[in-house]
Every structure is written in structure tokens, then in C-alpha cells.
Amino acid sequence: MREIVHLQAGQCGNQIGAKFWEVISDEHGIDPTGTYHGDSDLQLERINVYYNEATGGKYVPRAVLVDLEPGTMDSVRSGPFRQIFRPDNFVFGQSGAGNNWAKGHYTEGAELVDSVLDVVRKEAESCDCLQGFQLTHSLGGGTGSGMGTLLISKIREEYPDRIMNTFSVVPSPKVSDTVVEPYNATLSVHQLVENTDETYCIDNEALYDICFRTLKLTTPTYGDLNHLVSATMSGVTTCLRFPGQLNADLRKLAVNMVPFPRLHFFMPGFAPLTSRGSQQYRALTVPDLTQQMFDAKNMMAACEPGHGRYLTVAAVFRGRMSMKEVDEQMLNVQNKNSSYFVEWIPNNVKTAVCDIPPRGLKMSATFIGNSTAIQELFKRISEQFTAMFRRKAFLHWYTGEGMDEMEFTEAESNMNDLVSEYQQYQDATAEEEGEFEEEAEEEAE
């Protein structure tokens, strides 16, 4: 089977990672002790993608849990699924990264990274045919961002031909823990652009807005935000976990979704949106789902898709429904909104259907879009970065760990380049083909 090794780093990464395992274990009929109690062969057909089978028929997540302080791990260890993880796969330090990217990437994290890689190697060696890695982390803190990106580059060195996929939580002033989040995020994006194959941008700004506006929660908690994240992660991994034809592994997904190697930052979406504890009971139709799924309010990245254009889109419908209706609705969206899809990639919307819906819903849809509008998210962080960097505010925390100001300048310009690249393809039309080829040739030289 084509296995995936899952890593979770830092407080946020471990919290959303733990939720992810709770949700998918439930979908695959696996209880908190790792025992299967399901009712459908579909649940077990591709169980090996995320789980190892241990003695006594127990299923163990192929997960490596990493943090620079013991706190979050302790809560995973005392959480509902505490027995399911392999005890050796908890790797943690004592010092913490103090929300400092440099500590995660260069000092504290660098000391712990080898023991993490030992566990990763062990998991990879027991795989029959490893397809790649997925990391859950945030970009605003110290461990998930700094050490997370360090792990990515180390794993890249050792497994250069495996796919690297991340679920990256992007910081927002609306849900902020630290004032230096823009620094940490910019330094991280600088790494992600070069070293990952696919990154799902999960934006705290958007999660907060969904909880506040759509779900009418006046004071959203991290629990509420993480509920949305787990629904989204469950949705985007459906094709990897259940039998099906489309985007059935990480590489096929990358081939369909990434037209240019640097532009691999996806905007996820989910429909129907429900708050924790009140999954809706009203019947949904395929047209409803399709309409909601493309709605800006359902995007997990705070960007207006209407301000940009889609390079590529993948949609995953779950539940019992008519394939014919799904195809008709998806074509309908594209025909009605053709100006929002670049015309120089024909058939750039792909759809998959899985029979098993998520818990509590009859049907759902998950959206993965590679939209040029994601530049708005990078612009937002870049502006906050520049405001502080211009005054060299808080820099001493980073230079004190051995970093150079030059690295900040490089990260800043790399992110600005990324924004310009998205803009370039947003403006591109099919007629200009010739000009592009010339530019590409110049760049190649």
C-alpha cells in the first residue's frame, strides 16, 4: 500500500493533528484503543495509508509527534485517543521555542531534530511503498514554524523523491498569540515555497470569520476553529483514505493541482458549515453543496476568490449522490463563472465522489483551489512584516539566536516575488502565450 507518514509539530500542529486522528479514526471505525469496530469493507480497504497494523489486530497511526516543550504532548497523552499513538513516537524537548522561529529552526529545534528523524526513518522503513509525508503545524509560533520547516528540509534531503505535503495554519491579528507572528510566518513561507510540494493554507482569519459570521459564535474558541480544520483535513484526505480514481495519492494530486512549482499554496473550503455539536439535519442537495463550496464565505483562507482566478480546482463530494448530477453542477459552475478560471488550462476542475460521508452529515463537499487570490493572504502578512522590520522591532530575539538580518530581507523579497508570480498568471490570457515562452526561456538561461 502507498503509505503516508504524518508529522505534527508545535502546539497548534499537535492540537489539529490530534483532532485529525480522532476524526479519521472515527470514519474508519477505529476506537480509541486502535481496535476496528466498523461496518464497511471500504473502511479497511486503504487503512494502511495512515495506520500500521500492530499485533492483536490493533491499528496504530503512522504519526510522529514533535514539540519543544512537554505541555501539548501531555494533553494528547491524556486526551480521548491517548492509547492509540505509539509511545516511542512522542519526541519533545523541555526548553520551548518561545514563539521564536530562530529557536525552532537554528538552536533548540536543531538539537532535537536528529531524534525526530530517527523516528521518521523507523516509520519510513516499515513502509511497503512510502508515497510521502504530511506535516500539521502553524506558521505563527516558534516550534511548528521554525522546527517544522527545519524538519521539512531535512526530510527533503533524505527522501528527495517523496511528496511533501503540509497543513499550515496562517496567523491572523484576529486570533493572535504573539506580536512576532508576521516574522515567523514570513520566514516559514520562505522555506515552504522551496521545500514543499503542496501546502494547504488554513487561515486563522478565515476560520474566525466563519465561526463568527456563519456559525454565529460570538467568542470562537480554538476548539471551534479546530473543529473546522478537522472537517477540512478529513475532506481533503478522503481520496487518499478511501478507494477511488481521482487524486488517489499525493503525487497525482500534485500533478493535477500545481501548474508551476512555486505556486503550490491551496485554498481549502468545506460545505456545509456546521458548528460543533449541531451538525445540521436539513437535507442538502448537490446544487446547494456546489454553490456553497465555491462561496468565498466557505473558504478556509481569508481571500476573495472573486478577486483572482483559479489555476486549478479539485472537489471531493462525500455521501450517496448521483455522479451525473455532480458532474452537471460542476460544469454549470464553470460555465456560469468562466472568467474566474484561467482559460489557458482547459478542464482545470476535477471532481471525486466518495460514498462514505463524514460523521453527522448525509453529504458534504470539500474544495481545494489553487487560486491567484491567495496572494491576498501573503500580502497581508507581508505588510505586517514590513511595518515591524522597517523599524527593526523585535529583531534582537532572532539575531540573538545567530540569525542575520539578511535572512529577513531574503524572506521578505521571496514572499513579494511569490505575490508577483500569482499576479502575473492572474493577468495572463491565452493570447499572450508567445510572450510567456520568451520570458520562460530568458529565466531558464
From Swiss-Prot:
GTP binds at Q11, E69, S138, G142, T143, G144, N204, N226. One of its GO terms (cellular component) is cytoplasm. It comes from Gallus gallus. This is Tubulin beta-3 chain. Pfam families: Tubulin (PF00091), Tubulin_C (PF03953). Residues 429-445 have a biased composition (Acidic residues). The MREI motif is common among all beta-tubulin isoforms and may be critical for tubulin autoregulation. PROSITE patterns: TUBULIN (PS00227), TUBULIN_B_AUTOREG (PS00228). PANTHER family: TUBULIN.
